[in-house]
Amino acid sequence: MTSALHHIPHRTKKLPPLRVGIGGPVGSGKTTLLEMLCKAMRDKYDLVAITNDIYTKEDQRLLTVAGALPAERIMGVETGGCPHTAIREDASINLEAIDRMLEDFPDADVVFVESGGDNLAATFSPELSDLTIYVIDVAAGEKIPRKGGPGITKSDLFVINKTDLAPYVGANLDVMEQDTQRMRRQRPYVMTNLKTHTGVAEVVAFIEKRGMLTAD
């Protein structure tokens, strides 16, 4: 276990914690992105994370094994049904999880909430998330951005992950980017390859700026 896991920085200002929702289809890279964000931000901010799975706590286990944060700062929630419901129509199970985490870590700067794998219609309740990040992967097909759906068109940040797979699945990244710009208009997006950490810094910068974590 690295020393970074034992060092939790002190907050410089008292503000309600920023709640960041991370959604997207199964296998798109949500958990890997959350791991990368925790590792990139944990020395600067006080972080906690909540993961959603339907019948298991597999994502919680993966983050713990990866050393994203100390185990006590990662909570797994078993939704027992449609993952969309647990982040939108009835977010009570996640709101309760946030309350429990903040009882243990009242100085948290950021609460990450990773949804279970869902479809393009998934969105986070405003009660649950201040910022939303929606993740797709190139292997799902070049056409995904132009299919639309709230995750693609309305999320605060859209992430197109696994760009390294484009040549193997016949996806044209230029076309995906053009379709993304057309569907999202002025809303930001990032192309990522999390295996090489490509794009992670841009996602962190977005969270810091839009979440007003920095004075800049």
Curated annotation (Swiss-Prot):
Pfam families the UniProt entry points to: cobW (PF02492)
UniProt-recorded Gene Ontology molecular function terms: GTP binding; GTPase activity; nickel cation binding
SUPFAM superfamilies for this protein: P-loop containing nucleoside triphosphate hydrolases (SSF52540)
Keyword Chaperone: yes
This protein's UniProt keywords: Chaperone, Cytoplasm, GTP-binding, Nickel insertion, Nucleotide-binding
Any one GO BP annotation for this protein: urea catabolic process
Binding positions for GTP per the UniProt entry: G24, P25, V26, G27, S28, G29, K30, T31
Superkingdom of origin organism: Bacteria
Compartment list: Cytoplasm
Cellular component, GO annotation: cytoplasm
Cross-referenced InterPro entries: CobW/HypB/UreG_nucleotide-bd, P-loop_NTPase, UreG
Classification via Gene3D superfamilies: P-loop containing nucleotide triphosphate hydrolases
Function recorded in the entry: Facilitates the functional incorporation of the urease nickel metallocenter. This process requires GTP hydrolysis, probably effectuated by UreG.
Quaternary assembly: Homodimer. UreD, UreF and UreG form a complex that acts as a GTP-hydrolysis-dependent molecular chaperone, activating the urease apoprotein by helping to assemble the nickel containing metallocenter of UreC. The UreE protein probably delivers the nickel.
Stated family: Belongs to the SIMIBI class G3E GTPase family. UreG subfamily.
HAMAP family (alphabetical): UreG
Name of the protein this chain belongs to: Urease accessory protein UreG
